[in-house]
C-alpha cells in the first residue's frame, strides 16, 4: 500500500475540518456581530452582538469572538499544519504551526483581557463557573506547551541533542493535543453557559440568536472531530510509510 493512498483520508479529513471551521466562523460572527437586540422585543437585550464599545457591559462578546477564533480557527490550523504532507516535505510545517500558535496565543490573551475588563465594568463576579476554571487551566496548558515547543525546536534547538529534542517533542505533542481539546471543550462549555443565560433572561429558546450560538458550538465539535480523524490517519500513514521504507531497505540488502 503506497503512502499516497494513505494520505487520501488525511486530506479528506483536513478539508472536512476546514469546511466545518468556515461554518463555525460564520455562525460565530453572526452571533457576536449581528445579534444585539431581540428581534421580537427591541427592548430586550440579548447575549450577542458587539454593538457596544470594548469595555462596555456588552463588550464580553469580544471574549466570545476572540476565544472562538483562537481555538476554533488558529489552533485548528496549527494542528492541521502537521497533517499536510506538502508542508512537511518542504520543511514549512513547523513554521506554519508556530505562526498559527502565536496568533492563537495573542487572540487568547486579548480574549482574556476583554472578559476581565467587561466584568469589571459591569461589576460581575469573576472565577465562579466551571467555564472560568476550565478556561484558566486551558490557558495555563497553552502557555506551557507553547514555550516548551518554542525552546525545544526554535530557541535552543542547536544546543539540544537529538535525543533530548525527541523527548521534549513527545511531551510537546502530548501537551498540544491536550491543550487543543481542552480549549474546544471550554469553548463548547462557554456556549452552553451563554444559552442558559440567554434563556434565563427571557429570550425564546428557539430564537435565531439563541440557535446561532448553539449551532456554532455544534460545528466547533464537528471541527475537532474531523481534526482528530486527520491526526489519527496521518499518524497511521507515517507508521506504514516507515515500515515500507524499512522493508525496501531490507530487500536491497538481501
Where are the regions that the model predicts?
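Membrane-embedded alpha-helical bundles that constitute the cytochrome b-like, heme-associated redox core
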Residues: 2-254
Amino acid at each position: 500500500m503506497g503512502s499516497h493512498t494513505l494520505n487520501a483520508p488525511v486530506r479528506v479529513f483536513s478539508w472536512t475540518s476546514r469546511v466545518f471551521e468556515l461554518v463555525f466562523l460564520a455562525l460565530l460572527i453572526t452571533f457576536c456581530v449581528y445579534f444585539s437586540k431581540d428581534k421580537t422585543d427591541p427592548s430586550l437585550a440579548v447575549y450577542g452582538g458587539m454593538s457596544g464599545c470594548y469595555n462596555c457591559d456588552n463588550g464580553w462578546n469580544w471574549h466570545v469572538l476572540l476565544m472562538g477564533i483562537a481555538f476554533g480557527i488558529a489552533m485548528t490550523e496549527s494542528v492541521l499544519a502537521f497533517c499536510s504532507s506538502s508542508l512537511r516535505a518542504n520543511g514549512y510545517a513547523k513554521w506554519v504551526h508556530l505562526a498559527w500558535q502565536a496568533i492563537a496565543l495573542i487572540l487568547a490573551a486579548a480574549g482574556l483581557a476583554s472578559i476581565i475588563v467587561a466584568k469589571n465594568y459591569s461589576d460581575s463576579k469573576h472565577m465562579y463557573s466551571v467555564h472560568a476554571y476550565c478556561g484558566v487551566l486551558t490557558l495555563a496548558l497553552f502557555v506551557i506547551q507553547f514555550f516548551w515547543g518554542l525552546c525545544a525546536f526554535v530557541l535552543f534547538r542547536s544546543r539540544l541533542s537529538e535525543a533530548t529534542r525527541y523527548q521534549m517533542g513527545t511531551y510537546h505533542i502530548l501537551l498540544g493535543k491536550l491543550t487543543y481539546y481542552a480549549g474546544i471543550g471550554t469553548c463548547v462549555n462557554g456556549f452552553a453557559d451563554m444559552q442558559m443565560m440567554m434563556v434565563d433572561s427571557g429570550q425564546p429558546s428557539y430564537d435565531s440568536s439563541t440557535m446561532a450560538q448553539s449551532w456554532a458550538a455544534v460545528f466547533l465539535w464537528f471541527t475537532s472531530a474531523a481534526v482528530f480523524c486527520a491526526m489519527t490517519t496521518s499518524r497511521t500513514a507515517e507508521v506504514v510509510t516507515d515500515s515500507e521504507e524499512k522493508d525496501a531497505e531490507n530487500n536491497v540488502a538481501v
